[in-house]
Amino acid sequence: DEAGRLACLLARVVRHQENLTAVADKHIRGLYTGGTLAAESAGLLAERLNITPDEHHPQGMMLNALGHQIVDLGDDFYTVGRPHPMIDPSLRNQLIAELGEQTQVGVLLLDVVIGYGATADPAGSLVEACRLAWALRSESHPLHVIATVTGTENDPQCRSRQIAELEDAGVVVVDSLPEAALLAVALISPQRMAEPAPRSSLLDGVAVINAGLRSFAIDLQSAGTPVVHYQWAPIAGGNKKLARLLERLQ
């Protein structure tokens, strides 16, 4: 069961990766409104990138290594004197828009948390911010945005409507944080050139030794295939009585 789930996850990652331009050697930025989601995302990325997780998280910085950053915008540093980013997304939207000029960042990870108390249309405000960032990017410096949506169909914002709004704008919506981390790392990883497979000698032509019916050899010759015919037949034509007589003669 676990192997099946992993296979499905990897298949989804590959499918997304095939539709996105690689951003090899670029950085990953994560701007999360949920502290638990930010911590899990940081741990997953640290594992995939072989980075030692940070023990201390000043200013909500859950991961800060090799240019990659995962930030918990719900940290006290960002919420003193202002509403939580789930309620007021303006700070995150500003940081997203600023990524338009930070071309070293190739992948942006986001969470969309819906429910009572959250802003009325989290996806809509995120899309506006992403479009501001995308407008400053060229085709040679894309910014891929990967998001997870936490909530249900019964929430006021409706999970499926939020997903549709994000996907229509060009945001990649994935099912889980592990899927988001795997896809992000795959996009920034240098593409390995596949080594050519050794050529089978069968592709260089076929030579046949035919034993038995001569008609097989004739058919092969007519097709231009080199063939050597060896005249052979079962002893005594399969007659057991004659076979025993021949054995005695030998």
Question: PLM features: residue spans?
Answer:
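Glycine-rich phosphate/diphosphate-binding loops that line cofactor/substrate pockets in enzymes
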Residues: 22-23, 100-106, 137-141
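Metallocofactor- and cofactor-centric catalytic cores in central/energy metabolism, strongly enriched
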Residues: 4-6, 89-92, 104, 115-133, ...
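Short glycine-cluster motifs
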Residues: 24, 30-97, 102
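Structural motif
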Residues: 16-28, 37, 70-72, 107-111, 197-198, 203
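Glycine-rich beta-alpha junction loops
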Residues: 1-2, 31-39, 60, 74-77, ...
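Internal gly/pro-rich beta-alpha loop/helix module
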Residues: 1-20, 174
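Gly-rich Lys/Arg/Thr-decorated short loops/hinges at beta-loop-alpha junctions or inter-strand turns
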Residues: 66-83, 143-146, 162, 196-201
